[in-house]
Amino acid sequence: MRDYLKYCAYKIQYKQKGYLDLSREKFMYPTTLLPLLILVSEITPNKTIMPENRDLANYIQVARGQHLTDDTKTYIPLTKLPKQQRDASFVVEKIRRLAEDTEIAVENLNELIYIVEELIANIYEHSEFKEAYMFAQRYKNRGVMDLCFVDDGITIPRSFEKIGIIYNRDLHAEAIYNALHGLSSKREPGRGTGLKSVGRLVREGFEGEILIVSGFGAVYAAAKGEPLFITLLEETEFKGTLASIRVPLKKAVKSLYDFL
C-alpha cells in the first residue's frame, strides 16, 4: 500500500503545482512506477523534473516516448495489453520467462501463471478498457516478484452498478473486498471465483501480498494480519483498476486446487 500512496503523493503534487519533481528518486517499485509512467506519458515533457539517477531517468524517458525496451533478466518494461484477449498470450509468456530465470519450482510456476491469466482475464471480461498495461520486476536477492496491471476501464464499483449493486464512493473499498471474496458482476453460475482464488493463492499459497485499487477504494491484503481498507481523496481517484501482487518465488506453494 505504501508504494501506491507514494504515487498518490506525486499525483497530488502535479495537480497542486502543475509539475512533477522526481529529482530525488533512485528506485521505484512497480506499484508506484506503472501508474506514474502513465501519468508522465500524459503530461508535457517540460512539466516533469526527471530523476537525477540516470537509470531511472532513462527508463522514464523510454516509457514517455512509447518506445519499449527489450526485456531484461530482471524486469518486463511497460507493456501495453492488446485489444483482444486472444492476442494477450505473449504477456503470459514474458512473465513465465522472467520467473523461470529464478529457478522457480515447476509447481510454483504453474500457480503463478494461473494468477497472471486470471488477472488478465478479469481486465478483458469486466473493465471495458480502452488501454491497459503491465509491468513486472524480479528481485533475485529477495527471491520475490512484483507484478502490476492497470486499466482505464469502468472500475469495480461501476461494474457492480451494472447489475444493480450500488456502492457510494465511501464504500468503493468494500466493493473491491467483496470482489476478492467471490462477488461477481456476471450473473452466470460459477462466476466470481477467479479474483477470489487469486487473492487466496497469493496470500495463503505464496504467503504474498495483493493490492487492488479502483475508483475511490483500495484494499491491501497479506498473509498475516487483517486486510487494509482505504478511501482515496478526490485528487487520487483511480479512473480504472490497478492490481498489484508480490509473491515469493522459491517458497513451496500448496496445490492450486486448494484455492479454487
Regions found by a protein language model. Give the residues of each.
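Short beta-strand element(s) in the Bergerat
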Residues: G143-L147, T241
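N-terminal assembly/transducer modules of large multi-domain enzymes
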Residues: M1-G65, K239, S244-L260
